[in-house]
UniProtKB/Swiss-Prot annotation:
This is Flagellar basal-body rod protein FlgF. Keywords: Bacterial flagellum. It is found in: Bacterial flagellum basal body. GO terms for biological process: bacterial-type flagellum-dependent swarming motility. PROSITE patterns: FLAGELLA_BB_ROD. The basal body constitutes a major portion of the flagellar organelle and consists of five rings (E,L,P,S, and M) mounted on a central rod. The rod consists of about 26 subunits of FlgG in the distal portion, and FlgB, FlgC and FlgF are thought to build up the proximal portion of the rod with about 6 subunits each.
Amino acid sequence: MDHAIYTAMGAASQTLNQQAVTASNLANASTPGFRAQLNALRAVPVDGLSLATRTLVTASTPGADMTPGQLDYTSRPLDVALQQDGWLVVQAADGAEGYTRNGNIQVGPTGQLTIQGHPVIGEGGPITVPEGSEITIAADGTISALNPGDPPNTVAPVGRLKLVKAEGNEVQRSDDGLFRLTAEAQAERGAVLAADPSIRIMSGVLEGSNVKPVEAMTDMIANARRFEMQMKVITSVDENEGRANQLLSMS
């Protein structure tokens, strides 16, 4: 088989992977705090006894785009937005801590605070508020509750959000969509980040996704055309080999 087929096949495979990343970004264009996944392709020279005239294509995923999203003022007390390097802490399915910029906090049936189904972690563990109470969140993450029918002066703190600070190159997205520390960051800062009292939040505000839908749609069209071109290359090479075999059989 001609080596050109392997080259085009590898490029087509990586184009499909790039299309999957683009589709995932587009699907999360309305997810609060979402960070677009970056994807790139690079050429890898093929080493061997012959001349270095061919290259293969491999994916290079540098991480996520940490550009802040647009702030949307919702006036909802449980919506919070963080500083650029701030992260909310939630409990992942495996019990470990995960980090997110999604500040759309919900109250579960038992009063537990959650974000996308993950329990919100406070400085003492998962946070639970009294059922039916009016919740407010201060700039330092302190959560206060006012029970129904009680006078305003009886509002009392029930917990405090665990707010941590991590730069974009210190975290990476996991398969569950949550961010976790990279191996290098864990070696330097430990397996679990400590709460950072300098982080401040804004209540009643949500940070939107930093995905640009128009650009994502354009990328999807470009990926589709690139894949089609690579399929044509494979077809052309296969047809040329077929004609060459016919000529050899006639001689």
